Each structure stands twice: as C-alpha cells, then as structure tokens.
Amino acid sequence: MSEVVTYEDALKDFEPIIGLEVHVELSTQTKLFSSAPNIAGPLASCASQGPNTLVTPVCLGLPGSLPTVNERAVDYGIALGLALGCSIADELIFARKNYFYPDLPKNYQISQFDSPLAYDGKLEVETESGDVFFVEIERAHLEEDAGKLAHKSSTGRIQGAQYSLIDYNRSGVPLVEIVSRPVFADRCAPQVARVFVELIREIVLSLGVSNARLERGNIRCDANVSLRPRGLGAGILPNRTETKNLNSLRSIERAIRYEIQRQATLISSGELVRQETRHWREDRGITLSGRVKADSHEYRYFPEPDLLPIPIPSDKVEAIRLSMPEHPLALRRRLKAEWKFSDLQFRDVLNSSVLKQVDETVRAGATPDGAKKWWTGEITRIASQRRCNASDLISPEAVAEIELLISKGILNDSLARKVLAAVIDESLSVQQAIEKYDLSLTESASVERVLEKVLSENQEVVQKVISGKTQAVGVLVGSCMKALGGKADASKLRQTILNRLLPR
C-alpha cells in the first residue's frame, strides 16, 4: 500500500480500538523452570555469553527433563500484579500452549490460560496534554520466554534470509504478560498506549523485578488495533491486527498510528481488514503482513501435567504487598504537592522522563525549581543530541552541587553550563571542572573595578539610564560581562548599576 489516508481523516469516520499485550522479562538469577542463568537477570555478564551457553536439558525440552518453579519469579509476578491493581489468584496453575516454531524447542510453551496469576486490574494513564484515561487490565500471567532467531540477511530480517540460527539462551526466561482490555481513547489511542507501557516500565523499575531495557527486549509490546465505524454498536469489535514485538516507546506510538491509517484506507476503499499479525518497520514507518492470527482454541491449551497447582497463601501476598515501595502514581502525586509545581511544570518533568533524577537531585540539596531547570533543560538537550538517557550523563548529586554553587554566588548560569559540560564530557567532579577551567565567579573587588571602568567609558549610555531609559542598562551589563569573561552574576550587576545611577 503506497498511500494511506491522513490520521485526521481516518478519525472522521472510524473509532480506533486498541488492546495491548506487554511482555516483561523478570530479572531473577535463574530461569523460570530450570537452574540455568537468566540472560535477563541481574548478572550483566550473562548478556555477553555466547549463544546456547545458558541452557539446561529443561530449556531445550530434552526427554526426561522436568520443570521446577522458580519461587522468586512467582513473588515478582505477584508484586507486579499488585502494582497493577490486580487481584491475585489463590493457586498458581500452569498450562501448555501448543504451537510449532523453531525458537520453541518443546513445541509448546508453559504458560497460564484459565487461571492467570493476577487479574482485573486498572492503571491511570495521563497523556502529555493532560487527558486522563483508565486502562483496564484483564490479566497478568506468568510464562516462559521463547528462544531467539537470528536471520542471516542484509537487514537481519527473515525476508530474503538464506538461513536462520537459533539461540536458546532466552528460552525459559521468566515473563509476565500483561493483557489489557479494549481501550477506547479515540484520537489519543497511540499516546495512551505509549504512556501505558512507559508507566509499566516505571513500575517494574521501582519494584526491581526487571531491568526494563526495551532495546534489549526486557519489555516488548504487541499492539492490537481495530477500527469501528462511528455510530456502530458498542458491542461490535471488528477484525483486528496484532503488531508484534514493538521494543521502543516511539515505535509503539508510531506503529499504532500507522495501523489506524492503514486500516481506514482499506475499509474506505471497500476492502476487508485481515485478522493477522504484522511487523513494524521503523526505517520505513510502516507495518508489514506476518501470518494469519490464531485464536486461543488453536493453541489447544491444557493443564501442564508436569506441574501441580501451587497454593498462594493470602499471608504471602500480604507480606509482598507490605514490602513494596511507593507506587509511581502515588509518588508523582506526593512530589507534585511537595514541590508546589503547577500541572504544566510537573508534566514537563514527566514528559522528559526525569522524575527520578529530579527527586534525587532535590534530596541531594537542590531546590525543586533548580533541579527541574537542569534536568528538563540542558541535560535533556544533551541526551537528545547523543541519543542516550539523561540519567546516563551525570549524577543527581553533581547537579545538586552545581545548583548549590549558583545559589552561593560561586557560579552563574553561563559558567554552570560549562561546568556541566566538563563533568559530562570528561567525567570530572564539579570541583575538578571548576579548577581545571577556572570557572568560578570573579571576586567582588575585581567586579567593582571593571564596573567603574565601564561606567566611565560609556557616559552616553549612563545618561540614558539616568534619564529613565532603564532598558539601556543592558549595554552596560553586557560590557561588564564581556570584560569579566562571563564570570559574574548578570542580574546582580544590573541591580548594582541601577542602584548606583538612579535616585532612590
């Protein structure tokens, strides 16, 4: 399909309905059903291991091997379910999901079907524009991950590949799959999906149950999209597509937006939307057809015969609940009140994804406004240029130290930016950067000498200020700052000049 209708035109006649499946790899030491090291776990060295080295007979589905349940993975799943506002099941019951694919060595996946670990949850989602939606969560169930295929082609994709290799290091990694109920967010649907996944990432990081690196596949999202003609009955859900394995927040939003446009184009031209899986091509900004989407009965679920139901005591659930940190949504509300931020100010922090950094900077001694200024401004700008996370550039303690030096009059904003750059670029401490580049403000005696000289050499400008044209003071301030190499407080200089030239 070469051309699709615009997003605005698609929304005129159709209401988008989305459903989200978010797969979260748990960061346990070992896999879900075996003692093999977890490639998504806390040991960074695992990620650099060669293919098919983190496996056991259980991971490979060898005859005679039997699974045993990782209790820590169950605890992590319960904690995540509670954080999603879900009820927790009384028993842990596994089922076999039967299908054939090369990355599934047993030809079935141990998952859950009728009795998920957690169910009936809800998350509050707020978009950048301040619109609030409630995404209902149908279930969050525990399952094992599949292996990973490496397609040998110029693009790394299966299309045109001469052959594919299989790495079973990921096989058996514990997953929680979070399944939403249909979301009706109209034109905000792509944004709501992105913010929903972003909030889940924030939750799992606060709980410490996942590394939550989307680019490494620790969190993957499948986005179901269908369009309903406006005015059609609310109970009717048309054919849907499922765009698989979206692994960036940007891709989630763009893929859903494109799929809405693509389906609207098909329906408007009299064609049917095929119920299928699709794959997102980030480089082209389009989705491509995958395979016909299977219904649940085609997986022939049945109870896992090698794992008996495991009771989940209520006191265990309560103990996990009491051990959980403050929920990110509660944290947001508390910090907004403590910092006395307006809705716009706080949304700026959230949209820049630096809430944790601002909080830690404030706790290190900076003012909320000062911490926000640096993290949402200069640091975010540098991170955007370098395509990295702001948190990877500088510590909150260093930012707090810079802000404190500004408040003490040792640095001004211009010098502070130079200090910041040196700390980031050269891994210096704040004090090392100041000493290396002589970046502290000039002493007051030197400032006074420069001020006297500037006033005596600019009598015409001085007379303008005296006559009431106070905007001319900017010329005098600029001359002083130039003579001092920027090492002065411009606002204090301005006030000093006005106090000296104007009658009180």
From Swiss-Prot:
GO biological process: glutaminyl-tRNAGln biosynthesis via transamidation; translation
PROSITE patterns for the chain: GATB
Record field: catalytic activity: L-glutamyl-tRNA(Gln) + L-glutamine + ATP + H2O = L-glutaminyl-tRNA(Gln) + L-glutamate + ADP + phosphate + H(+); L-aspartyl-tRNA(Asn) + L-glutamine + ATP + H2O = L-asparaginyl-tRNA(Asn) + L-glutamate + ADP + phosphate + 2 H(+)
Gene3D superfamilies in alphabetical order: 1.10.10.410
Keyword Isomerase on entry: no
HAMAP family: GatB
Family: Belongs to the GatB/GatE family. GatB subfamily.
Record function comment: Allows the formation of correctly charged Asn-tRNA(Asn) or Gln-tRNA(Gln) through the transamidation of misacylated Asp-tRNA(Asn) or Glu-tRNA(Gln) in organisms which lack either or both of asparaginyl-tRNA or glutaminyl-tRNA synthetases. The reaction takes place in the presence of glutamine and ATP through an activated phospho-Asp-tRNA(Asn) or phospho-Glu-tRNA(Gln).
UniProt xrefs under PANTHER family: GLUTAMYL-TRNA GLN AMIDOTRANSFERASE SUBUNIT B MITOCHONDRIAL AND PROKARYOTIC PET112-RELATED, GLUTAMYL-TRNA(GLN) AMIDOTRANSFERASE SUBUNIT B, MITOCHONDRIAL
Name listed for the protein in its UniProt record: Aspartyl/glutamyl-tRNA(Asn/Gln) amidotransferase subunit B
Species name: Tropheryma whipplei (strain Twist) (Whipple's bacillus)
